[in-house]
Amino acid sequence: MRIMFMGTAAAEGYPALFCVCDRCKKARELGGRNFRSRSQALIDGRILIDFNHDALYHSKLCDIDYTYIKSLLITHRHEDHFSPYELNYRNRGAANLDEGVEKLQIYGPSDIKPPLERFIRDDNNYGFDVNTVEPFEPFDVEGYTVTVLKAVHGGGALIPYIYLIEKDGKALLYAHDTGILPDETFDYLK
């Protein structure tokens, strides 16, 4: 299993936009790899994790063509992980795709569905489908077993997830942007 981290920073990026602390000043001075964009990753060139405002930058920086990516896991609906507006650009009128390109299958917590529903159109033959997933219920994504696990982040109104991704005897726990995990998540992982 190969993971490409395209972005590893928090919402403010690094160095932070308006920060003048010594670390951010030094990062600006050094440049290059000291700059970090918002969280996004790609598993084996097939499964994308999170889609934020830096997605266009990531596609250029990492030479990734999102057109043929069929699966997207969303960890939570904060904008540094999830941008429904960017996903709208996959719809007719904004994108001209090759015939036969499959709809993007988006998997995530139930609270990502309402902001995406406004972009789902009946005449859309290559946009996306939204699949809500529940904790501790493994499901298949392109031959990978994906298990949603509960995370702690952002207060009570947010539904944050982390993902356990397994294939061919290998496992990846993708656990970004979370506090101390709930006991039931630790119990599941034992």
Located regions from the model:
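Active-site metal-binding motif and surrounding structural segment of the metallo-beta-lactamase
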Residues: R46, F51-Q105
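Catalytic metal-binding/acid-base residues of hydrolase active sites
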Residues: H78, D111-I112, G179
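A short helix-to-beta-strand connector/capping loop
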Residues: E102-K103, D123-D129, E142
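Core dinuclear metal-dependent hydrolase active-site scaffold
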Residues: M1-I64, T132-T185
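Inter-motif core of Ras-like GTPase G domains
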Residues: L189-K190
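A short, active-site helix/loop in glycosyltransferases that binds the activated sugar's phosphate group
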Residues: D111-I120
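Alpha-helix N-cap/helix-start capping motif
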Residues: H53, S110-D111
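Extended hydrophobic secondary-structure segments that form protein cores and membrane-embedded regions
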Residues: Q105-P109, T132-V133
